[in-house]
Curated annotation (Swiss-Prot):
Claim: Repeat is one of the keywords in the record: no
PANTHER family referenced in this protein's UniProt entry, alphabetically: TR-TYPE G DOMAIN-CONTAINING PROTEIN, TRANSLATION INITIATION FACTOR IF-2-RELATED
Binding site for GTP: 411-418, 457-461, 511-514
Region described as G2: spans on this chain: 436-440
Gene giving rise to this polypeptide: infB
Organism: Cronobacter sakazakii (strain ATCC BAA-894) (Enterobacter sakazakii)
Protein name: Translation initiation factor IF-2
Keywords, sorted A to Z: Cytoplasm, GTP-binding, Initiation factor, Nucleotide-binding, Protein biosynthesis
Length: 903
């Protein structure tokens, strides 16, 4: 055995160096930490320690560490692996024969002492049970005797009292004799009762003793079984295990575990011995799962030896589920709804002839076929089911009542629409409009002698096509205003088309009839060409001659409107939840989103929950066209409502609903659908669009951030600006909205290099700071003409100039000379204009261009000159061209740039 140092020996036997040095010193062997220790010194130290502490039995300690992997089922059908490490430690003791005999003798003495103690305990218990039974029997007999004596005394007293009252003094002797006889009889009965009680007590005592003996015998048998198993356990522990390899040690440990736990009444299943890991898996996954199940199974209960019992019974038939399928669904979502793996769904689709991936979106019909093929019940769900349910859950009265007509005034710009309505309302509205033209839809209701009429005043400018179309859709009657001195104009024709598209009757108001050059007959002729036939010509359109300035014919116009409404028999339900249409909307800085709503049916009350396109909210306030607060609005009444979550789009349907939560869900659903449709329309990634972009070349863009006061103006301006786009310059609206110009708008304009345009709105303080810091182009407008003209000018500045060739001189070749430096030199006479050097030229022969190049040399009498005027001779050298002949014409021109503009 090789020598080791004290330090190494301390590490080997797992003790401190200082303690080992001290033990060597106590044994008479002085050592330091770095000194070496021989085998003789080790034996001497061991002998010293045995003398000091006594020699213990030989022991063998085995430490075992096993690792395993456990798969745990997680959420979503996924499983994760958990590493488990089990550490065990067993100590085996080898004792000498003398020690074993001594321990066996001690154990035998211990068992005998326990047996003696058990017998003494049984005898003591038996004696105690007998004494207890005797005491209970005596107490019971005593109590019964006392109770009997009391009863006898009471009976005696009663009888004596009765006898005293009935018998006379002569019968006293007989009574005393009867009493003595009765007393003797009672004493005999008492003795008989006492004897019976003693017999009962003795019987119970014997029964208790027999029961105690039986219990003691049973306990003795159980203890004997335990003692025998305990002795076997100890005898096994004292056996000698000669372990030579780690495999044998593990086998011995497992055998010992089974014997020990079998003696305790708990039979653990046999553990599957794990082999060391190698590159090839030595056992299958099923074997590993079975082994782990055997190790884990039944922690809390008693189990039989090594039986592997499956705890879950597979159902006899598949579970059929109700699968709810929307309009579109992914394969993974369908598998999740059916509680199956995605691979099974893909297999089922492949059997049906459809290839799909797990994240592929499939339509409703395909999903229905797959689900039914796999045995499930399918419930088809429409995406707008919630929207339809909310819309249908409304209280409406059944009684329809006559309502006021909704009249839209349409016509060409500056034909007097607003002035006509202004006279009817006896107000001055036109002066408030910028430039004297209407740029919003104005909604008013007026009370006449014959009833109420609601008027919608639409713009006549060409930019407000969408706004006029909305007015025609929401109306009952269209009043077409045509100036008598101007006749039918483009917007007049457009108004006729809108009225025909909406199938709305038309009443023609021939305005400005008081002007000297008014010609109503010309108006009738022009309108008849577009399908508007007067009644006097056999048509169905009423013509009324009016003057908005003088008030002529206004009453006749109102009568014609009311007559037309009576023919239409306009009715609406007045009671119940209201519905209507958004005429106009805008963002007020102090009040938030404001929407002008025309109620079609029902009654709109303050506090109602309304659903309006993508927006929803509770009506916080309602105002009429005179800016007066109102609490309710019936059919055909226009009102401004406050309280929506955002600015709705003009033309959106307004519906009163019951539940604000459902209204929010429907609004969010509509926003999502709109976003999907918007994304679907973006075709930049499509092949045909890619080729179109390749062929376009470089296209300049004018970026604009547009803010206006109302939604209709935003639509009109955006549409007009986008129509200005050409193949070379395009208008791009990078941002638009309703309300003032904010810091966000300014930041967007700075990032996209855009022009900030405000139509009837202004920038706030924070936006102005950003505009000044970034030097942005901010422009305010109140008339749409000026806005469109300036954007046109900006676009024209981005157009590349047009190149034009202008002829500046013409020379005739009279002779041809040869020059060693320039080749053929043409001797020419300037017949027109001026010949300039280094200008492009054309050589013409018989008025046909045969060459186009550059004038390289220009001389007059051997002197180089820059230009030669008309009527002078000169020599011309054409660059890279020598085929000049007499009689040719040399044409000199220059290229000039002409700035283009957008019409």
């Amino acid at each position: 055995m090789t020598d080791v140092t004290v330090k190494a020996l301390a590490a080997e036997i797992q003790t401190s160096v200082d303690r080992l040095v001290q033990q060597f010193a106590d044994a008479g062997i002085p050592k330091s930490a770095e000194d070496s220790v021989t085998a003789q010194e080790k034996q001497a130290l061991l002998a010293h320690l045995n003398r000091e502490h006594g020699s213990g039995p030989d022991k063998l300690t085995l430490q075992r560490k096993t690792r395993s992997t456990l798969n745990i089922q997680g959420t979503g059908g996924k499983s994760k692996s958990v590493q488990i490490e089990v550490r065990k430690k067993r100590t085996f003791v080898k004792r000498d024969p003398q020690e074993a005999e001594r321990l066996a003798a001690e154990e035998q003495a211990k068992r005998e002492a326990e047996e003696q103690a058990r017998r003494e305990a049984e005898e003591a218990a038996k004696r105690e049970a007998e004494e207890k039974a005797k005491r209970e029997a005596g107490d019971k007999a005593k109590r019964e005797a006392e109770e009997q004596a009391k009863r006898d005394a009471a009976d005696k007293a009663k009888r004596e009292a009765a006898e005293t009252s009935k018998v006379s003094n002569q019968q006293t002797d007989e009574v005393s004799k009867a009493a003595q006889a009765e007393k003797a009889r009672r004493e005999a009965e008492a003795l008989e009762l006492k004897r019976k009680a003693e017999e009962e007590a003795r019987r119970k005592l014997e029964e208790n003793a027999r029961r105690v003996a039986e219990e003691a015998r049973r306990m003795a048998e159980e203890n004997a079984t335990k003692w025998e198993s305990g002795s076997e356990e100890e005898s096994e522990d004292t056996s000698d295990y000669h372990v030579t390899t780690s495999q044998h040690a593990r086998q011995a440990e497992d055998d010992s575990d089974r014997e020990v736990e079998g003696g305790r009444g708990r039979a653990r299943p046999a553990k599957v011995a794990r082999q060391k890991k190698s590159n090839k898996h030595s056992e299958s996954k099923a074997d590993r799962e079975e082994a782990r199940a055997a190790v884990r199974g039944g922690k809390g209960g008693k189990r039989k030896g090594s039986s592997l019992q499956q705890g879950f019974n597979k159902p006899a038939q598949a579970v059929n589920r109700d699968v709810v399928i929307g309009e579109t669904i992914t394969v993974a979502e369908l598998a999740n709804k059916m509680a199956v793996k995605g691979s099974q769904v893909i297999k089922a689709m492949m059997k049906l002839g459809a290839m799909a991936t797990i994240n592929q979106v499939i339509d409703q019909e395909t999903a229905q076929l797959v689900a039914e093929e796999m045995g499930h019940k399918v419930i088809l769900r429409r995406e707008n089911e919630l929207e339809e349910a909310v819309m249908s859950d409304r209280d409406m009265g059944a009684q329809a009542e006559p309502r006021a007509p909704v009249v839209t005034i349409m016509g060409h710009v500056d034909h007097g629409k607003t002035s006509l309505l202004d006279y009817i309302r006896s107000t001055k509205v036109a002066s408030g409009e910028a430039g004297g033209i209407t740029q919003h839809i104005g909604a008013y209701h007026v009370q006449t002698d014959n009833g109420m009429i609601t008027f919608l005043d639409t713009p006549g400018h060409a930019a407000f096509t969408a706004m006029r179309a909305r007015g025609a859709q929401a109306t009952d009657i269209v009043v077409l205003v045509v100036a008598a001195d101007d006749g039918v104009m483009p917007q007049t024709i457009e108004a006729i088309q809108h009225a025909k598209a909406a199938k709305v009757p038309v009443v023609v108001a021939v305005n400005k009839i008081d002007k000297p050059d008014a010609d109503p007959d010309r108006v009738k002729n022009e309108l008849s060409q577009h399908g508007i036939i007067p009644e006097e010509w056999g048509g169905d359109c009423q013509f009324v001659h009016v003057s908005a300035k003088a008030g002529t014919g206004i009453d006749e116009l109102l009568d014609a409107i009311l007559l037309q409404s009576e023919v239409l028999e306009l009715k609406a339900v007045r009671k119940g939840m209201a519905s209507g249409v958004v005429i106009e909307s805008f963002l007020d800085k102090g009040r938030g989103p404001v929407a002008t709503v025309l109620v079609r049916e029902g009654t709109l009350n303050k506090g109602d929950i309304v659903l309006c396109g993508f927006e929803y909210g509770r009506v916080r306030a309602m105002r009429n066209e005179l800016n007066q607060e109102v609490q309710e609005a019936g059919p055909s009444i226009p009102v401004e409502i406050l309280g929506l979550s955002g600015v709705p789009a003009a033309g959106d349907e307004v519906t009163v609903v019951r539940d604000e939560k459902k209204a929010r869900e429907v609004a969010l659903y509509r926003q999502g659908k709109f976003r999907e449709v918007k994304l679907a329309r973006q075709q930049k990634s499509k092949l045909e669009n890619m080729f179109a972009n390749m062929t376009e070349g470089e296209v300049h863009e004018v970026n604009i951030v547009l803010k206006a006061d109302v939604q209709g103006s935003v639509e009109a301006i955006s549409d007009s600006l986008l129509k200005l786009s050409t193949d070379e310059v395009k208008v791009k609206i990078v941002g638009s909205g309703v309300g003032g110009i904010t810091e966000t708008d300014a930041t967007l304009a700075a990032a996209s290099n855009a022009i900030l345009v405000g139509f009837n709105v202004r920038a706030d303080a924070s936006a102005r700071r950003v505009i000044e810091a970034e030097s942005l182009d901010l422009r305010y407008y109140s008339v749409i003409y000026n806005l469109i003209d300036e954007v046109k000018a900006a676009m024209s500045g981005m157009l590349s100039p047009e190149l034009k060739q202008q002829i500046i001189g013409l020379a005739e070749v009279r002779d041809v000379f040869k020059s060693p430096k320039f080749g053929a030199i043409a001797g020419c006479m300037v017949t027109e204009g001026t010949i300039k050097r280094h200008n492009p030229i054309r050589v013409l022969r018989d008025n046909v261009v045969i060459y186009e190049g550059e004038l390289e040399s220009l001389r007059r009498f051997k002197d180089d000159v820059n230009e030669v005027r008309n009527g002078m001779e000169c020599g011309i050298g054409v660059k890279n061209y020598n085929d000049v002949r007499v009689g040719d014409m040399i044409e000199v021109f220059e290229i000039i740039e002409i700035q283009r503009s957008i019409d």
